UniProtKB/Swiss-Prot annotation:
Residues the record marks as active site: 334, 432
Function: Catalyzes amidations at positions B, D, E, and G on adenosylcobyrinic A,C-diamide. NH(2) groups are provided by glutamine, and one molecule of ATP is hydrogenolyzed for each amidation.
Segments forming domain GATase cobBQ-type: 252-440
Name of the protein in question: Cobyric acid synthase
PANTHER family recorded: COBYRIC ACID SYNTHASE, DETHIOBIOTIN SYNTHETASE
Pathway: Cofactor biosynthesis; adenosylcobalamin biosynthesis
Top-rank taxon, per record: Bacteria
HAMAP family registered for this protein in UniProt: CobQ
Naturally occurring in which organism (per UniProt): Methylorubrum populi (strain ATCC BAA-705 / NCIMB 13946 / BJ001) (Methylobacterium populi)
Gene Ontology molecular function terms on file: ABC-type vitamin B12 transporter activity; catalytic activity
One example of a Gene Ontology biological process annotation: cobalamin biosynthetic process
Amino acid sequence: MTRALMIQGTGSDVGKSLLVAGLARAFTRRGLRVRPFKPQNMSNNAAVTADGGEIGRAQALQARAARVAPSVHMNPVLLKPQSEVGAQVVVQGRMIGTARARDYQAWKPRLMESVLDSFERLRADSDLVLVEGAGSPAEVNLRRGDIANMGFARATDTPVVIVGDIDRGGVIASLVGTQAVMEPDDAAMIRGFIVNRFRGDPTLFADGMALIAERTGWTPFGLVPFFPEAGRLPPEDAVALDVAGAGRDGSVPLIAVLRFPHIANFDDLDPLRQEPGVSVAFVPAGEPIPAEADLIVLPGSKTTIDDLDFLRAQGWDIDIRAHLRRGRRVLGLCGGYQMLGRAIADPQGIEGAPRALPGLGLLDVETVMTAEKRLVAVTGTTLADDEPFSGYEMHVGDTTGPDAAHPLLRFADGRADGAVSADGLVAGTYVHGLFANDRQRAAWLARLGAAPGLTNYEAGIEAVLDRFADHLEAHLDCDGLLRLCRPL
């Protein structure tokens, strides 16, 4: 009989996604058929499913932890921010429109139908559904029509365990305060709590755990010590980049990644961040691109035209041209590839108001935004060295021009992708996930004069998931969590 458990948090980035992934691996190893589920996610870091849909990257990692293929039903509502007040709305893998934050509230009753439909589909094919909430149930101003936290928990009668992050401080106030602001019927859905990311001697917080339990009446399910290897797993939230780009090692080649306001699919760079032979720095607003950079990467973007305007406002276009005069390399990924061309046109207003503007002019190609979004897994080889790759496309827009006659990649179905400049210093591609391929990554490192030190990226992810599952089994009452799960 299928059971379900919902993991909510006192706020964003308290570790909900990773805890669900670790529990998914732990319970899968016990022989259970586990399915991850997040009713509503907000992220521009998405993954492509086998049926050509898209879901949040965190749910794809959780599916991997559960050793099942990602499904659009694991994240039935995905919001992809395009501005400070609006987002694309993806339902069961397909974009259905764009909504402003205020207008989105009116969509929720209809979206709840899709959420419950997807949940039932997963329930029918599993022993345990691990549900992840979004943000915090303490955001009571958003409670009416909620589909992400208590609205879902109440609709399905799914028990909730809430997570607090002690590493950021104030965990007692966060947990006790969450209960204090909630309606009694919502608060009653929370059966226990987890304190995450503890550093030091856990016995020193025993009184804190007891105090939280006494004040709330919740069962303590464990104090999870900080897990340093979590940084080796692909991040979903761009907030992780604020930490990721902090350090530079002047003794190895430097890869500078432009930190666009609407950066998307930035996990493309995660395998490079783990390579000891290079240093990866995300360049924030207001800072010049380091002159010592060996490679500049223009990453994916949810709003390419706006982020191109932003790039110019930072003076990065000037830095890029100076970089090329020094004989260094530039790589554009997806939206970054579009920026490298002569022009970008959006006549249908796919990204906002219809407009067109000049590109950087570093590749002899032009892009026209199109209504149809391409979502597909791809395989093939690079034209330069015939090295194999696998990855995925996730973009709107067609890019054509003379430099496209000199593509970077050739797909297995014969199609070409990307473009390379005549001098070979500038390249662009629509393919995401290129650097997760060990031989592709090694080839790019060789071009920078660096030796690969990470021999098998994918095997490394698997090993970290197993070690994190071990970590949770050692520090959480996993048997108690299973007993809490109600049969559906």
